[in-house]
Amino acid sequence: MALHWKLVIDTADAPALADFWAQALGYEVEDPSALVEQLLAAGRLPAEAVAEHRGRKHFRGFAAVRHPEDPYDPFTGIGKGRRLLFQDVPEPKTVKNRLHLDVHAEPGGLAELVARLESLGATRLREEGQGPAGHWYVLLDPEGNEFCAA
């Protein structure tokens, strides 16, 4: 049986990094505001566990993005398919990622993809390969997490 999964990424500012990756991937930022409001009203969530971003309440220190074509719970906003969850952590990133995302350009569109990602806040680190593995760029997201565009 195949398992459902999500990739969890440690951050300093979960909502901001979710915004970047939603734009970079063409994903939707999840909106848990209805669930947050319900939990607040029922006294099951303390006010200090809630923050607001772009006019919507969310769980403090967390944000997620999901593929726009994948199923999701319309009340909670939580995706049931391809999903990235960002969680705030107190320590800064200090070493290279052991896991990273590769984003793929349309044929012939790598330069345009890299330029678009840079316009969203990514930083180009280096260009790699021209051999059998192909041609790609290593970039950093706004918090310094490595990813590749190929």
Residue ranges and their predicted role:
Residues D13-A14, E106-G109:
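Helix N-cap motif at beta-to-alpha junctions
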Residues A2-I9, D19, Q23-L25, D31-K93, ...:
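Vicinal oxygen chelate
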